[in-house]
Amino acid sequence: MVEKSEISKAKRVVKRALDLDQNEADTRRGIERVLENVCGLDPLENLSREHAVRGAGETEYVDFTLNIKGEIVMMIEVKRVGLPLALKHLNQLSKYTIDKGCNWALLTNGKQWKLHGISFFAIRTRIVCKRKPSQAYRNS
């Protein structure tokens, strides 16, 4: 059970971060404390920082992954506390989650917390019509 004092403390941390207009790295540290103290996550067992995600040939890094029994169950992307969350941030995080086959994505700036369920399907191709190469593009 989460103590009310921990939630109050987390609210104060976010307000102070907003007042100081903290950068993304400072916001990340604050979010990590919230995940540990309010959500009760073990930073050694449940959280991985700066997890490498290989996209279209480039390696990028998601701020945190939430791991249960060694399996990534959620990707967490943190933006600077004063930066409103935008669709481009969700698109970035969605790429990461799909790349890792993860269904949950949490996007936050400390003030806003948006949990998204990501649905995706394996890309499969199937032949729907088979013709000889010479007939492939000829009108019937």
Over which residues does each language-model region extend?
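Phosphate/diphosphate-binding loops
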Residues: 109
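A short, conserved, highly charged catalytic patch centered on acidic carboxylates
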Residues: 1-104, 112-140
